[in-house]
Amino acid sequence: MFSRLSRSHSKALPIALGTVAIAAATAFYFANRNQHSFVFNESNKVFKGDDKWIDLPISKIEEESHDTRRFTFKLPTEDSEMGLVLASALFAKFVTPKGSNVVRPYTPVSDLSQKGHFQLVVKHYEGGKMTSHLFGLKPNDTVSFKGPIMKWKWQPNQFKSITLLGAGTGINPLYQLAHHIVENPNDKTKVNLLYGNKTPQDILLRKELDALKEKYPDKFNVTYFVDDKQDDQDFDGEISFISKDFIQEHVPGPKESTHLFVCGPPPFMNAYSGEKKSPKDQGELIGILNNLGYSKDQVFKF
């Protein structure tokens, strides 16, 4: 599955007893750190799953692409951790001049055990209330957050492999899932990411994704899809959408030990899986994945 993909598709991980105890404890930590890192730093958790909003200042704003920025938020202390677990997110809120609350979910792209700060990658949408507000902020301005919001309870080695299908900022929860899986030496799950964008310049988190692929070639693979490579002669990906034929050839089938995770804008979701009905209702599986024979229980929509 992780071999180089054909260009033909460019179209369509006493003393003896002490040693054993240490080894066992180490294995337990690595096997569980993705879901339960908060167990080891309970007092340092900022977000505890209650209804309390916490105002956090922006420490840095960086350009990620022509319409996307990376916001770094400072946690209360240098030893503070978010308190999130794998496949979870945060609510962000601001209050309009008329007193209305605008609330949106965001998935941090930082390591879950990162101390002192966390990062969000946010795309500006024309007419989007939250994104317009965020893009009008500057360092030291604050945003209110609460959480975590649980999305999916990941269990290491539950599947032999998983496939992540994403487009645009849909990469955020997929990247959080991918990099914590492949960096856990006790989780042997193979991760295959299919990521679509308009142009190579629109690919978000590309540096991080390429670094994962280089460091963990046996556990992680990413294929980029673009509508137009423009003048990027070094682009090494597919100049097409993520086709049904490509998925059928390069993704484990419905009868294998696999699971698929999908995240992207509404048209993308409708094409591959259908949208969720609500945060707690995945809705029916439609689109390309349904046509390929995958069941509703094999696909999760972020």
UniProtKB/Swiss-Prot annotation:
This is NADH-cytochrome b5 reductase 2. Keywords: FAD, Flavoprotein, Membrane, Mitochondrion, Mitochondrion outer membrane, NAD, Oxidoreductase, Phosphoprotein, Transmembrane, Transmembrane helix. The outer membrane form may mediate the reduction of outer membrane cytochrome b5. The soluble inter-membrane space form may transfer electrons from external NADH to cytochrome c, thereby mediating an antimycin-insensitive, energy-coupled oxidation of external NADH by yeast mitochondria. Involved in the reduction of D-erythroascorbyl free radicals. May play a minor role in complementing the function of CBR1 as a DPH3 reductase in the first step of diphthamide biosynthesis and tRNA Wobble base mcm5s 2U (5-methoxycarbonylmethyl-2-thiouridine) formation. GO terms for molecular function: cytochrome-b5 reductase activity, acting on NAD(P)H; NADH dehydrogenase activity. SUPFAM superfamilies: Ferredoxin reductase-like, C-terminal NADP-linked domain, Riboflavin synthase domain-like. PROSITE patterns: FAD_FR. It catalyses: 2 Fe(III)-[cytochrome b5] + NADH = 2 Fe(II)-[cytochrome b5] + NAD(+) + H(+). Its cofactor is FAD. Belongs to the flavoprotein pyridine nucleotide cytochrome reductase family. Residues 1-41 form a propeptide. It comes from the Eukaryota. PANTHER family: NADH-CYTOCHROME B5 REDUCTASE (PTHR19370), NADH-CYTOCHROME B5 REDUCTASE 2 (PTHR19370:SF171). One of its GO terms (cellular component) is mitochondrial outer membrane. FAD binds at residues 158-193. InterPro entries: CBR-like, Cbr1-like_FAD-bd_dom, FAD-bd_FR_type, Flavoprot_Pyr_Nucl_cyt_Rdtase, FNR_nucleotide-bd, OxRdtase_FAD/NAD-bd, Riboflavin_synthase-like_b-brl. The chain crosses the membrane at residues 12-32. Its EC number is 1.6.2.2. The record marks 41-42 as: Cleavage. GO terms for biological process: cellular response to oxidative stress; ergosterol biosynthetic process. Disruption phenotype: Simultaneous disruption of CBR1 results in resistance to diphtheria toxin and K.lactis killer toxin. There are two isoforms of NADH-cytochrome b5 reductase, a 34 kDa form (p34) and a 32 kDa form (p32). The p34 form becomes firmly anchored to the outer mitochondrial membrane after an incomplete translocation arrest. The p32 form is formed after translocation of the p34 precursor to the inner mitochondrial membrane, where it is processed by mitochondrial inner membrane peptidase (IMP) complex and released to the intermembrane space. Induction: By osmotic stress. Present with 1920 molecules/cell in log phase SD medium. The modification Phosphoserine is found at residue 278. Residues 51-155 form the FAD-binding FR-type domain.
